[in-house]
Each structure stands twice: as C-alpha cells, then as structure tokens.
C-alpha cells in the first residue's frame, strides 16, 4: 500500500525583534535540509515578516513487514526525554519549545519488522551542503528491556556507534543512550567523543510524576559558546545538544 503526507507551517512574526535584529529574516528562513527551498519568507518588511516551511513531505510504501519512506520525515531513534545522543538525524534543542513539531530530515528510510518487539532500519539523509549521514539501527526486547544498537557515518566526516535501552527498576522508569563519534580523517591519531544521557522517572499513587535526566557531552570544550544566543541559534547536530 502507498501513503503520502504533507505538513506546512506558516508564521506571521511582528515586533521590535524583526527590526532590531538585522539578520533575523535570514535566521527564520534558514533550512539545513537538502530541500532547503521548502522554507522561505513570503513577505519581509521592517517590523514584520511572513514565513512558510514544509515540515513534512513524504511517500510511504508498505508490504508485509517491510516499509519504505522517502522525503522530508522525522526519524526518531531516541530513548530518553530531553537529550538524545542516539538521534543522529533530527537533533533539536530542548529549549526550542515554541513549536511542538520536531524537525525533519530529507531522507530515505528502510524499515523491517521481524517481530512485534524488534525492528531493523537503514536511513540515509542529505543536508543542504550535500553531506551524507547514513546509519543502520536495530531494536529488540530482552530481559524486560528495550535495547537498540546503531552505527554509521555522520555528515561524511565522522564514524558513529551507539546503543540505548529503556525499562524499569523497582517500578521506576530507567532509560539511557550513548553514542561514540570519531573523525574519519587521521582515524588512528585522533580521539573520539562520547555523548551519553540517563533518565529516571516515577509516578506516585496520587498521580504525581517526577522525572530526572542527566547528560554528558564530550564535545563541550570544542563548542565555544559565548552566550545562550550563540547556542540557541547555531545549527543543531547530535554533538551540540548540551
């Protein structure tokens, strides 16, 4: 069977920020995907602008346990809630909460489901600079936990390998993700980067829900953040999550 999906976001932005921030128009219309022309400003004036962006544009084919999706889509391999080192394709800032729809990738995704609790995937995306991110992914359930393993290449520049799991300990939810990244150039002479997150959650009898999460980013010293703005507006990748 075939399916298709389209989702468009339209924004009218008005205020002093548009006028006082000279590069704000370019920032709003910036799209890092291969199909970057799907985002543009329809109207640009001194104090307001009108922006449109195609969030999703895909075709999907299903035959038995096999599925293929082509186009702008969300590829979510995360297990934890706030920071997702395993989410190679759609990294996003947790502080960017003004829009519930998460970013998509311009990609081809192959999916196979051997059983109800297992899945194998292969995904390839191309960004605006024609850099390729490609990875394989396998998920299974064992010992009461959901386990996942992945490996691939990030933006034609780095090898990646990772794993994650989610389950519970004494009734409390427990999830972890870890990804190791190493440059493909001078592979033997360079050190890699470890990204890891851990999350714990618990719901009490009175429905009070508590959740805690921590994150380690081995790339932090190389991010050179001078302010919160320099973090918030920089291109998001799995290495710039913190």
Regions found by a protein language model. Name each.
Residues 92-94, 114, 118-128, 134-138, ...:
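Transmembrane beta-strand segments that form the barrel wall of outer-membrane beta-barrel proteins
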Residues 166-242:
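Detector for outer-membrane/organellar transmembrane beta-barrel domains
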Residues 2-118:
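Outer membrane beta-barrel
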Residues 50-55, 62, 102-106, 130-134, ...:
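Residues that define the transmembrane beta-barrel architecture of outer-membrane proteins
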Residues 2-8, 68, 119-122, 147-149, ...:
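Transmembrane beta-strands of outer-membrane beta-barrel proteins
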Residues 1, 56-61, 108-112, 136-140, ...:
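Residues on the lipid-exposed face of transmembrane beta-strands in outer-membrane beta-barrel proteins
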Residues 53, 62-65, 114-116, 140-144, ...:
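Outer-membrane beta-barrel strand-turn architecture
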């Amino acid at each position: 069977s075939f399916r298709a999906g389209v989702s468009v976001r339209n924004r009218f932005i008005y205020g002093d920020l548009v006028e006082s921030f000279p590069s704000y128009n370019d920032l709003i219309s910036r799209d890092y995907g291969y199909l970057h022309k799907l985002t543009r400003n329809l109207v640009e004036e001194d104090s307001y602008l009108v922006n449109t962006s195609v969030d999703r544009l895909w075709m999907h084919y299903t035959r038995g346990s096999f599925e293929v999706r082509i186009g702008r889509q969300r590829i979510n391999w995360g297990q934890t809630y706030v920071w997702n080192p395993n989410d190679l394709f759609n990294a996003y800032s947790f502080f960017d909460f003004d829009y519930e729809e998460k970013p998509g990738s311009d990609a081809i995704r192959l999916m196979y489901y051997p059983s109800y609790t297992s899945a194998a995937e292969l995904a390839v995306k191309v960004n605006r600079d024609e850099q390729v991110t490609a990875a394989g992914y396998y998920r299974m359930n064992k010992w009461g936990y959901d386990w996942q393993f992945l490996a691939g290449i990030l933006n034609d520049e780095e090898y990646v390998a990772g794993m994650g799991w989610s389950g519970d300990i004494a009734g409390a939810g427990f999830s972890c993700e870890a990804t190791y990244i190493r440059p493909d150039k001078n592979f033997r002479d360079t050190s890699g980067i470890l990204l890891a997150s851990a999350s714990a959650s618990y719901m009490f009898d009175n429905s009070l829900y508590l959740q805690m999460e921590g994150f380690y980013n081995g790339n932090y010293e190389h991010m050179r953040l001078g302010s919160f703005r320099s973090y918030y507006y920089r291109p998001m990748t799995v290495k710039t999550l913190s």
